[in-house]
Amino acid sequence: MPKRKDIQKIMVIGSGPIIIGQAAEFDYAGTQACLALKEEGYKVILVNSNPATIMTDKEIADKVYIEPLTLEFVNRIIRKERPDAILPTLGGQTGLNMAMALSKAGILDDLEIELLGTKLSAIDQAEDRDLFKQLMQELDQPIPESTIVKTVDEAVTFARDIGYPVIVRPAFTLGGTGGGICSSEEELCEITENGLKLSPVTQCLIERSIAGFKEIEYEVMRDSADNALVVCNMENFDPVGIHTGDSIVFAPTQTLSDIENQMLRDASLKIIRALKIEGGCNVQLALDPYSFKYYVIEVNPRVSRSSALASKATGYPIAKLAAKIAVGLTLDEMINPITGTTYAMFEPALDYVVAKIPRFPFDKFEHGERQLGTQMKATGEVMAIGRNLEESLLKACRSLEIGVCHNEMTSLSNISDEELVTKVIKAQDDRLFYLSEAIRRGYSIEELESLTKIDLFFLDKLLHIVEIEQELQMHVDHLESLKKAKRYGFSDQKIAEIWQKDESDIRAMRHSHSLYPVYKMVDTCAAEFDAKTPYFYSTYELENESVQSNKESILVLGSGPIRIGQGVEFDYATVHSVKAIQKAGYEAIIMNSNPETVSTDFSVSDKLYFEPLTFEDVMNVIDLEQPKGVIVQFGGQTAINLAQSLSDAGVTILGTQVEDLDRAEDRDLFEKALKELGIPQPQGQTATNEEEALEAAKKIGFPVLVRPSYVLGGRAMEIVENKEDLREYIRTAVKASPEHPILVDSYIFGKECEVDAISDGKSVLIPGIMEHIERAGVHSGDSMAVYPPQQLSKQIQETIAEYTKRLAIGLNCIGMMNVQFVIKNEQVYVIEVNPRASRTVPFLSKVTGIPMAQIATKLILGQTLKDLGYEDGLYPQSQLVHIKAPVFSFTKLAQVDSLLGPEMKSTGEVMGSDTSLEKALYKAFEANNSHLSEFGQIVFTIADDSKAEALSLARRFKAIGYQIMATQGTAAYFAEQGLSACLVGKIGDAANDIPTLVRHGHVQAIVNTVGIKRTADKDGQMIRSSAIEQGVPLFTALDTAKAMLTVLESRCFNIEAI
């Protein structure tokens, strides 16, 4: 069927900020969809609140709105733009929920706007637990016994009838938010109460647990002519009971017989046809390992995380084709862009194995609840491709960047058998490593299967890896053993460990015997047809399919999996860098391991290598491609950490040189550089042991900020007030050593701001200064940032610009640089310099209109700012006010304290822009879901050192109609100063303590601060987690509360008696 002519203007709804459960895969999907619709001649309007995305670049759609994804704002944009249709299926759960809200509010009917892709009835049938159950019964598809409940009592009655364990699934939530497996009535009551609150329709499904079944997923496509096909089937390593986003996944399925595969395939196609979905859809099924019995678990009537994985695993561009299907094109008339000859109706065939392993944030959150269940906890994922399962699994392990080069954690060799068995049974994020350790200790795979319900096939593969390790131990320097290990994915580093040699020795041995990897193409058709895609993975076989180009090439290193501190912002910079390389006439090669991102879309670069970002894997690509040089500036700390070893191997690092990168990262060299440049910094010293650290702190004076050197996202950073705390920090948080010194700095409690600069070595362009709303002590990634600055004098801005210029030129910076400053008593100090692209690049690029990563790349390739038409110094400021606000995923991470501090905790960001600070702040708070009612009750529980400041805030809250409540000490202080506050009870005082008041809806906001010492006070943590669980706005920094107050005051009318 030809594309529709009756619609011209289509609105695409984005997925908003990155949170756990909804990450970069939607930037990838949305970007593909917008470009596909433009390609077909439609006018595309995009709405999204996340500035860190490629999708929100001006050239992706005809009009781009970076506005809050709330009914209020989306309605305004719709009324202004009057689109003919809306495509909501590429914006994740956010997009679907927005479509439902627009429909319920009558806006779609009122303006005669059509929904494309998935009809409302299908969204309802797939998402509303009752309707889904009815549909499955009509289709004769088995689902676990279940009931829909709207109260806790209904849940208890049902569970008593069918027996425990049961699973709770709240309706219309994302990534299993609020759900869980319950083994007792007590757990059921707690989880259901929470789930009902988090479900927008106050509805939960309670179902019989089928934990232990195999979990299988089918990614299916259908068009308006009812053509349907399976793009990819995937099998979870972990059985049902662990959210698929937290499971290790293999594609294609590994343990299904033909009969089982056909049975589940038929079920999936039957479901997508019944739902009449036009586009992509994901079906999750549970299969009994011992019979042909299966159950349908759920259906996502949209592009999802699994579709991004399926797209990258097969090369089949699901989102692009889904967008075209939505406007009437059919699968049998669209060409598959990979082969350029076959049609999209052709089901992909794979002659390789793909492994996906999730990346969890527990290296940042040591106290987080690590046990996995039906609620997702991973922030990102890695994917690896190999010719056998062992190879793809080991490549994925070393892609994770968690300090392992194999499926082995050396620290586990010391744990007791008892602890090992517990960890194998109770699945945590690192269960794979415990299983492998158990096999190394001689546990049989049959024993492990009965404990974990993981299929024997997978456990046998882990056993095979251990057998190869043993073979290597017995045959040191043996060429055949080396070849076998390489064929099954072993890294040079692991083989070197076993043979007690250096990694370079193994590399030399391989080269002397011409043992190199070859690169195979991902072609969707198992090499049956010629493919045109330059998309490759390495393996140790005979035939190489990747040929070095005759054009000069540049290799750009990506940033690996998304984790806290290194998010989609770095992928944004990578993609822009590639565009600039191509414009300059070079061939652009990307190397990355993250399946969710735009950079790993094969159409972005001239060549894509889907490989781990390790020295060995990068060198193998360099040996084959012989690029002119490598760019490491845009891949976050991942790429920067590879610079030294690549340079030592004779590779040309383009842009800022390795010794200059080192001067910015190495404490003593940096201090020396600042002294020479005449730039003040907080007093500080490096310490390699406890004694030195105590000596340094004594000299500098408490409080001090302590942290390890060479980290990203403020990992293991703390503010300490006395000797005891410093000793405690050194013993528990870091292992200080001469190789890994710790930094001890004077802690300056002042205003923070940061600058991104672009330098060609002679002149320096400063696109803008961002002022942080929260004072020093809160990580820059967790602060709200304002551009242009609202409270910095002209003189301070000039000083900042001057220091930035001196630094860029003094450190021989070519390309990007980020500098952070703290200002106290009109004195400007430099806190740190990062000689690379930072997480503020997308935001600043959007608000200034300067394509920063592209300009930086042009300078790296030899042009000057003058050539590009840019002046030296601070760029003219925008007339609008722009706010970048952090977004957190605390609802997904039990036992992670939401208190803000020097260690980064946010997973994403939103942006608010308007003509005044108050309006921009209002938009930023709305966009990150911190909606505060205009009156109500607010609780203050404040540390002694900030009570005076909190008092003035409390008075202002009272003036606009809030009732002030406070804990004992705070209430007493307020009373002394003449402000009466309602006293709340101590924790445990059942009727009147804060968690109880919050649970019963009596509290609209909480302001809770702790002293500099920031001790893990149990009461404070209970208060904070109750606010997070119940969705009550929580302010742990007074500056944020003050910003919110500014918004409320601006929306208030003055009401006075005459």
Curated annotation (Swiss-Prot):
Q: Where does Mn(2+) 1 bind?
A: Q284, E298
Q: Which residues bind Mg(2+) 1?
A: Q284, E298
| SUPFAM superfamilies in alphabetical order | Carbamoyl phosphate synthetase, large subunit connection domain, Glutathione synthetase ATP-binding domain-like, Methylglyoxal synthase-like, PreATP-grasp domain
Q: For the region Carbamoyl phosphate synthetic domain, what residue ranges are annotated?
A: 547-929
Write down the required cofactor(s). Mg(2+); Mn(2+)
Biological process GO terms, please?
A: 'de novo' UMP biosynthetic process; glutamine metabolic process; L-arginine biosynthetic process
Q: Where does the record place the ATP-grasp domain?
A: 133-327, 671-861
In this chain, the stretch annotated as Oligomerization domain covers 402-546
Name the residues that bind Mn(2+) 2: E298, N300
Where along this sequence does the record place binding of ATP 1? Answer: R129, R169, G175, G176, R208, I210, E215, G241, I242, H243, Q284, E298
Instruction: Please tell me where Mn(2+) 3 binds in this chain.
Output: Q820, E832
- Keyword annotations: Amino-acid biosynthesis, Arginine biosynthesis, ATP-binding, Ligase, Magnesium, Manganese, Metal-binding, Nucleotide-binding, Pyrimidine biosynthesis, Repeat
- Subunit and interaction comment: Composed of two chains; the small (or glutamine) chain promotes the hydrolysis of glutamine to ammonia, which is used by the large (or ammonia) chain to synthesize carbamoyl phosphate. Tetramer of heterodimers (alpha,beta)4.
Q: Report the family membership.
A: Belongs to the CarB family.
Any idea what this protein is called? Answer: Carbamoyl phosphate synthase large chain
